[in-house]
């Protein structure tokens, strides 16, 4: 997958409704679907499209958050953050630097911190090299296609 994320520059758009369409839509789509002009997409192209769909859903949520507050950078952690390609796409689409923590079990760490009573002396996690936004017009075009297709199928996202 990491190599595919570097090599594939024009994957199809994937409407990711696996398990239901999450925030900010919170509704069902009929079926997850790849939007492409042909049925010749490779497994690699479909895998990259799935990763991009995650980035697109994150971006949609970021845009809604930024209606209420300013965000200057993103910090990511956990399993999927191990994918450099995902982090770079998120930086390029959001226009913000992305910093990744060296913590593949961020959810478990967060639960442990809460269970410990939120101690102020909790050990910090080291940051790994980050990702700066780079111009990626095709990615932004696929994002627009993704949003337009979701709005056509589901309507506007739920109100803030």
Where on the chain are the PLM-derived regions?
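Glycine/Thr-rich phosphate-binding loops that ligate phosphate moieties of nucleotide
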Residues: 1-160
């Amino acid at each position: 997958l990491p190599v595919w994320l570097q090599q594939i520059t024009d994957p199809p758009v994937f409407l990711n409704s696996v398990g239901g369409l999450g925030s900010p839509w919170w509704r069902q789509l009929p079926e997850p679907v790849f939007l492409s002009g042909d049925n010749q997409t490779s497994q690699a192209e479909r895998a990259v499209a799935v990763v991009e769909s995650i980035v697109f859903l994150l971006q949609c949520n970021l845009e809604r958050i930024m209606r209420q507050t300013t965000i200057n950078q993103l910090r990511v952690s956990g399993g999927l953050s191990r994918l450099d390609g995902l982090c770079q796409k998120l930086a390029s689409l959001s226009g913000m630097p992305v910093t990744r923590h060296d913590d593949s079990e961020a959810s478990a760490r967060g639960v442990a911190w809460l269970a410990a009573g939120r101690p102020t002396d909790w050990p910090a996690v080291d940051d790994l090299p980050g990702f700066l936004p780079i111009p990626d017009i095709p990615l932004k075009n696929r994002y627009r296609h993704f949003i337009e297709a979701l709005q056509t199928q589901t309507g506007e996202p739920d109100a803030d």
